[in-house]
Amino acid sequence: MTNYGADLLWVLIFASLGFSAFAVFVSISRQRRSRPPTVAHIAGEDVAAEAARKVIREFEKNGQSADAALVTWSPETLRKILADDLPGAQVIVVSNREPYIHNSKNDDVELLVPASGLVSALEPITRACGGTWIAYGGGTADRLMVDDNDRVQVPPGNPSYTLRRVWLTEEEYQSYYLGFANEGLWPLCHIAFTRPIFRASDWEAYQAVNRKFADTVVAEARNERPIVLVQDYHFALLPRMIRERLPEAIVITFWHIPWPNSEVYSICPWRERILEGLLGSSIIGFHTQFHANNFTESVDRFLESRIERADAAISYGGQTTLVHAYPISIEWPADLLAKLPDADDCRARLRNRFGLKADVKLAVGVERLDYTKGILDRFHALDELFKRYPEWIGKLVFLQIAAPSRGTLPAYKLLHDECHRYAEELNQRYGSEGYKPVIMVAEHHSQEQVYEIYRAADICMVTSLHDGMNLVAKEFVTARDDEQGVLMLSTFAGASRELLEALIVNPYDAAMMSEALLQALNMTPDEQRERMRPMRQMVRDNNVYRWAGSMLLDAARLRKRGDLDRVTGAGDRPPSIDNVVSMFERKRVALS
């Protein structure tokens, strides 16, 4: 009875860890009862049992401490997860774009923080976690600011992590970044009806640059078990390259753009190679479950693999990869809000800058000049509004901030010309002395300037033709601590799954968008507040620290499972999905 009582306790412990752990217990129990209890065997079993108990206690202790911490998601939460659940782990972030750029200006060095959704999401995370951020050094003074190992400590004045710059030749940059990544993968993954262009020379450069970044990751790793956060479509081959050289690393790849359905994906000449590269990841994250499902379907169609849809796991080449949705977000509260004037002052400053009358309604759009963002479709909607409701002519101005982007590529040159031409047409058709309905500003703006624009706007238009998430929508909501303003949001942006109180529109339907514009223009302050308040609460509760914390907790569970498997001998078996996902009960922490 004593043995069975102890076994019952073990059942409960292992069941809490998942089915595969329970299977390990059953196997050990059967072996124990099938042979005589010799002294030597009992001693060895006690040692193994005690080792298993130690790992389980650590596993449970860490899980409980993390659960207790996850009430408010903040930098402190992330640091606690790292300290309690991933002690000693080195965090390495890899992205194409760097968080700080040094440029030469008038015999001096100017520091720039790029207005990038990826940077605005990841920079506060890296500040909180420390570690190393590896990125392409493209600033004209970047080489002047690094040490002999191509490193610079950032942020300036209060450094908390290392920026490791990787140098690319002009040919590498043109072919890897502008070529394969942005003429090939970018249009392939976005339903914007721009034809992808694939060249063998671009593919060769893409492979070479991914290898260069893999070399840098290995060089920067302080041990064999770093946590590597690979960012976006520039590095589809990198996870497999890291896995081959650092097999014990936890590689978390986050794909920031949509993943197409398998029929569209089949266009890519190197489709199998890209999937194989990504499946070197321990975890692959997407903004939405829809895109995660598309990825899984692509793997199912093009690779011989084992897929467990219930567990969201793919087994390929002796390794299991978990595929999940992690909706990205932004920092809350945004540090820069404390530095900004209130909404009324921002309105006055912006209207003074552009010579707008006090009673004119202001709609804004803020993004890179990109064919996926639906800028021309906003112009169509404005045209339709003025045709249907001419009384709004002279009473509404649309300000489009369109940061120059990839301007050497033909598709972007064409978009630039079309946008400026259409804006001028609208101004000629509906403008008058002292009034232009469209103001097009093709300049880079700092994050502070962008937030001032958000606070000054009556309406923010986010009308992407296709977007993984779109953080402009969340930034606008965050900026509006006055709980005023109306968000118009494309149904084809991932953010529309979360910001449900926005006016959700189809950017291809100009008539629908014009009616939504009219609704926004006539919306009362009370209704604006009723819509803005829950959206702000959603961003607050689901901020970028929760996004990162969810992935780090999942990484911790994977690492603990690996440690447990090694102790119990499960690690000696061929890798299988059961070894990995059975313990992976998605987010047992209270996330509400």
PLM region spans:
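Catalytic cores of carbohydrate-active enzymes across secretory and cytosolic contexts
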Residues: 10-591
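Short, strongly hydrophobic alpha-helical membrane anchors
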Residues: 1-6
